């Protein structure tokens, strides 16, 4: 009698995982968002779904992955918009219309434009980029100032060490002179006696 794990993956769960991941690949979404979606449906963690996909399921769907990538490429060509900047709901609308599954209505266009308005604009990205550039320049200037201060302190330390060594040498010579004078006096006193 073999014992199976309580949390073992079933064929249906593997199939759901494959379908969702392939759909996300086709629509230009990320695998992580696919794993999160499957995780919610199966009450598993996204990490568990990712592990199952990478360790077992993906190997069985290589041709499906290639086909999904090809479809995504074709969809991008037809739409003329990079789906990286589009939310999933917009991708689904664009996907459906480009494949001829339905005609666009005014409501679809309005919905698309409202969602498009909510996505960060190129101007916002540019402003964020400029802000980050300024931060980098500020940090580089601060780093340069700290390096300069560090070099100044090193130079001062080196000069102090040299002065200290010179002072020790002078004191050593003075001590030797005092010792030699005392030795001279003692010898002279010894000779006189």
Swiss-Prot record:
<keyword id="KW-0010">Activator</keyword>
<keyword id="KW-0175">Coiled coil</keyword>
<protein>
    <recommendedName>
        <fullName>Sporulation-specific transcriptional regulator GerR</fullName>
    </recommendedName>
</protein>
<feature type="DNA-binding region" description="H-T-H motif">
    <location>
        <begin position="35"/>
        <end position="57"/>
    </location>
</feature>
<keyword id="KW-0749">Sporulation</keyword>
<dbReference type="InterPro" id="IPR017930">
    <property type="entry name" value="Myb_dom"/>
</dbReference>
<keyword id="KW-0678">Repressor</keyword>
<feature type="domain" description="HTH myb-type">
    <location>
        <begin position="1"/>
        <end position="61"/>
    </location>
</feature>
<dbReference type="GO" id="GO:0003677">
    <property type="term" value="F:DNA binding"/>
</dbReference>
<keyword id="KW-0805">Transcription regulation</keyword>
<dbReference type="Pfam" id="PF13921">
    <property type="entry name" value="Myb_DNA-bind_6"/>
</dbReference>
<comment type="function">
    <text>Transcriptional factor that regulates the expression of several late sporulation genes. Controls genes of both sigma-E and sigma-K regulons, acting alone on some genes and in conjunction with SpoIIID or GerE on others. Regulates, directly or indirectly, the expression of genes encoding coat proteins such as cgeA, cotB, cotC, cotG, cotU and cotY.</text>
</comment>
<dbReference type="InterPro" id="IPR014243">
    <property type="entry name" value="DNA_bind_RsfA"/>
</dbReference>
<comment type="similarity">
    <text>Belongs to the RsfA transcriptional regulator family.</text>
</comment>
<feature type="coiled-coil region">
    <location>
        <begin position="122"/>
        <end position="177"/>
    </location>
</feature>
<dbReference type="InterPro" id="IPR009057">
    <property type="entry name" value="Homeodomain-like_sf"/>
</dbReference>
<keyword id="KW-0238">DNA-binding</keyword>
<dbReference type="InterPro" id="IPR001005">
    <property type="entry name" value="SANT/Myb"/>
</dbReference>
<keyword id="KW-0804">Transcription</keyword>
């Amino acid at each position: 009698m073999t014992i199976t794990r309580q949390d073992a993956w079933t064929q249906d769960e593997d199939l759901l995982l494959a379908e969702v991941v392939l759909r996300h690949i086709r629509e230009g979404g990320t695998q992580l968002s696919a794993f999160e979606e499957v995780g919610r449906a199966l009450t598993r963690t996204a990490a568990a779904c990712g592990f199952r996909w990478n360790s077992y399921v993906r190997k069985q769907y290589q041709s499906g992955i290639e086909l999904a990538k090809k479809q995504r490429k074709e969809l991008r060509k037809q739409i003329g918009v990079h789906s990286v900047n589009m939310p999933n709901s917009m991708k689904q609308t664009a996907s459906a219309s480009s494949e001829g599954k339905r005609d666009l209505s005014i409501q679809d266009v309005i919905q698309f434009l409202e969602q498009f308005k909510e996505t960060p604009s190129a101007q916002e990205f540019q402003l964020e980029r400029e802000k980050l550039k300024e931060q980098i320049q500020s940090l580089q200037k601060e780093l340069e100032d700290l390096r300069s201060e560090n070099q100044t302190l090193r130079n001062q330390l080196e000069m102090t060490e040299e002065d200290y060594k010179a002072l020790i040498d002078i004191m050593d010579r003075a001590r030797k002179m005092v010792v030699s004078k005392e030795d001279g006096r003692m010898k002279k006193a010894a000779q006189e006696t």
